[in-house]
């Protein structure tokens, strides 16, 4: 049920009111910094739109709710691409829209990272969300509202705020360590790991490889600790070791640009010099482009000084 979701009381009230209005179709933009929380709200609304047991909410235990949770519901479609949903995916959505509902009820289309969509794909999507078919609900997820204006003009906005340290039941120091990422914090709370114990920056490559092989919170924390060790030691690290640090990251990520960008984002949050942050963010944002990743990482690490 909506009441079981921690935080964002206003967002929950908005969705409940939408359900009470008996809307027959719609397009929404859920936006905020916590991607996992955006998806949690999107799936919660999807459950409420398809739940057979509960009115203006979801029970969480019926067959429909359970299949939404496991992403196996016949009328739930999720589209994503780390570099932005492509035109071919939008064409797939168009085909799906042209067919009948599998289960005879509402259909939910969740599109992730819509702020990354290129203009061609966004314009193609626009044709579908202008006048959705009865029973079709589009939920667009985005980190920000840097989205094609015509798409925004045809959507309802819902800001999903990051959960606070108090809501997550941790200290502000712990909250800052994870940059407020709720999913990681909840996983960390189950481990008993001491965040005060450090990890050496020169082991960053091994920590990344371990995480890629087994992506759990224990291995993720080791990456964070290693990055923090590099940051606090940066004034005492020579040029050769700096380049070695960047190369260790490059060879370990195996051209995984999403993880590379996440690592750079974490480092950006450690910087207090706002002039330098601007340059770092510019370099970080180039990672998603088809440019030399190894060179970008070297430039990024060099800019930290």
Description of each model-found segment:
Residues 47, 51, 127-130:
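Short, well-ordered alpha-helices that flank and scaffold nucleotide-derived cofactor binding pockets
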Residues 78-79, 111, 160:
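Conserved beta-strand positions
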Residues 110-112, 125, 136-143:
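Structural recognition of the conserved hydrophobic beta-strand(s) that form the central parallel beta-sheet
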Residues 1-48, 55, 64-67, 134-137, ...:
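Charged, glycine-rich active-site and insertion segments that engage polyanionic ligands
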Residues 73, 122, 144:
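ATP/adenylate-binding site constellation spanning eukaryotic-like Ser/Thr protein kinases
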Residues 84, 116-117, 131, 146-147:
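Residues immediately C-terminal
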Residues 13-19, 87-108, 116, 120-128:
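Conserved alpha-helical scaffold flanking the Walker A/P-loop in AAA+ ATPase domains
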Residues 55-64, 70-80:
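Conserved catalytic segments around the Walker B and adjacent sensor/switch elements
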